[in-house]
Amino acid sequence: MWGRSFPGWAFALLIVCVPPYLPAQTPSREQFDDLSRRAQAALDSHPDEAIQLYKQALAIRPDWAEGWLYIGGALYQLRRYAEATDALRKGLDLAPIFANGWALQGLSESQLDDADQALADIRKGEQMGLNGNVQFETAVRVRAAQLLIRSSAFDEALAQLQPLTGYPNEAPTVEETMGLCALASAVDIAAIPPGRRAVVDLAGKAAWSFATQHPDAAAAEYRELLAKYPNEPGVHYAYGLFLLETDIKAALAEFRTEVQNNPQHWPSMLAIASIQIRQGTPEKAIESLHAAMKIAPTNYRWLCHLDLGRADLDANNSAGAIAELEAAARQVPANPSVHFFLAEAYRQAGRKADADREKAEFEKEKAQQDPLGVPALHSFGISK
């Protein structure tokens, strides 16, 4: 499984090896070149041997960043994650320009139960631009998505997987991870119960078909999912997301069925509320959102506040809207949607200076495209 092993081909993706400067035609240079060549040759098949050779080369030139990064890759292959992280960190301290090095460090940290730091380093690598091979990028993005799913950040997990839709991916791990997103199931992919795995697999297959622009196949797969597993948690929610673009009333019915079957399914409550806002029934939305607020994870309370603010705006309750949207802004200050609606609330209340300030903040954050700015529910078209 990705994240537990590091394919040999990926070493070539880690960096573009640039030999350090050493005086030409010296014993040290000749010895260094010999050690680095032998280490490179051993890297895929004999990582233990490669590590020792790289260490000898680094004794000659300790500031050789690429050597530290290759040691980190070899240690990762051997599942010596703490040592791998240390070696990668040394290499990146010397040469922080290697995007794939940051991504690999994130993969290594993810095996040390340091999810926050792992995600930070993976994102840094992504922002710099992962390059070299689709399989490497897939491994990185799938692992990041799995970490996010465990904390119920299904929106960000989907954002990690979305770029992979343009590649000819046939890896089952991609579909499994997509299945957990579609079902809004916050579990470790390795801990899926045997009886649940078929549900996750089929949900992932359907969601992946939809994401890769195969709507007919997705429709058939979602119908199969619903027919086979009508009482499994998340199934009606997943089908409701699929229906949003074509039949919003049917989607609403699916979300309501999900809540009936699974009263703790807060994503369905948020979906119901967002549809109710669109349908012009903010009072009903407020009721749904207060119910969701009681059970949603802490990192999703901001979304409850945001939609409560939107509902209050529609109900011409500017004071209530401002209170809710200010609460959302405190939790996610870099979210452009929050600043957009807060500007509207201030404008409705006649607070022009505050409205102008929030509009400017919205424009700034929108340009930066904060990853929290497009929740999964919104990305499926529930609210704009």
Q: What is each of the regions a protein language model found here?
A:
Residues 70, 104, 139, 143, ...:
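Canonical tetratricopeptide repeat
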Residues 60, 94, 128-132, 167, ...:
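Structural marker of alpha-solenoid helical repeat scaffolds
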Residues 31-32, 65-66, 99-100, 133-134, ...:
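Helix-start (N-cap) detector for alpha-helical repeat units in TPR-like alpha-solenoids
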Residues 170-208, 213, 344-384:
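Terminal, low-structured helical/coil segments at or just beyond the last alpha-helical repeat
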Residues 110, 123-128, 142, 146-149, ...:
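TPR/TPR-like (Sel1-like) alpha-helical repeat modules
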Residues 30-60, 77, 198-220, 224, ...:
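Alpha-helical segment of the N-proximal tetratricopeptide repeat
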Residues 43-53, 77-90, 112-124, 151-159, ...:
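Structural signature of tandem alpha-helical TPR/SEL1-like repeats
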